């Protein structure tokens, strides 16, 4: 048989038994957390019309989206993001619902990663969207919920980097850069590529004094005192509003008791271009990339016909699992509660006993034709916790302590 029959496409992965159990456990923990925080779960189709994500202002890079066609030749897209479908629902199916809307989801997304990246093409994302609330308190709630999500999942060491898109935009206004130039600067700032940034600002003929201050942007990283440093760099009103907003969010997060998790990073500017205010990402030393990200996207809902402020975050379950593995967690395949030897002669007695135990919440795995020795071996090798068999019409259970069938 060809080896290719056993291969899966690049960027995809299988999830085996033990990890699958752990994933479902985490998903249920998050569902409970989101629900108890007032968020209602939605599901959106894996296929949407491509135009849903092809917005000229807030859309996705065409090269990152999986596309196909329906029978009428219309272009479809495999969902690369969960925020835009949630906004679509809020602006259509939920148009009559009063604000604020609190929506959550746990579902897959798929997108081509950047060239040379080892990222998965398909991943499961859990997240929340809080629409209709503009205050810094709403932003703080979303960030606190992201932190609580990582805690609930069992991640021990992580931090949240907090930034503000408006601070970067204000600086770009002051520099007088075009949108194309701004995007190039954004990439250099995000990558902390100081040399490339310096050379590019010189190429764009940015005035020396402004360029000197811009060069400090990637270095605005640390505790709350960074905000005072930032305010000393510019008098731009947009920048000042951004730093004030972050101070308000930090104050609220202190009341949540989560201030210790937060670092300020004003050089963080997400590639996803629908963010309009505060942005954040969750990182851990166990991974080379963020496992969650989010922020405020007040301009996005209006593009779909319902103008309203909005904020939210998405957490990659796949990256969370990788982080748990890196911190030493293992996912052994779950052992059966009971292995029950079954033959045709004792089938009725075996089925009645198994059904009773299952009603009691005990897992029963039927083993057809297994001998008593084979059943005992399954227990001794960890494949099952206990063993049972049918003898003379009665179910007998193996006692490991007494080495006998009872």
Regions from the PLM with identified roles:
Residues 1-84, 140, 161:
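TRNA-binding/sensing appendages of the translation machinery
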Residues 64-70, 177-199, 206, 258:
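Acidic, His- and aromatic-enriched active-site or binding-groove loops in soluble protein domains
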Residues 145-152, 166-176:
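Hydrophobic mid-domain F-helix/FG-region of cytochrome P450s
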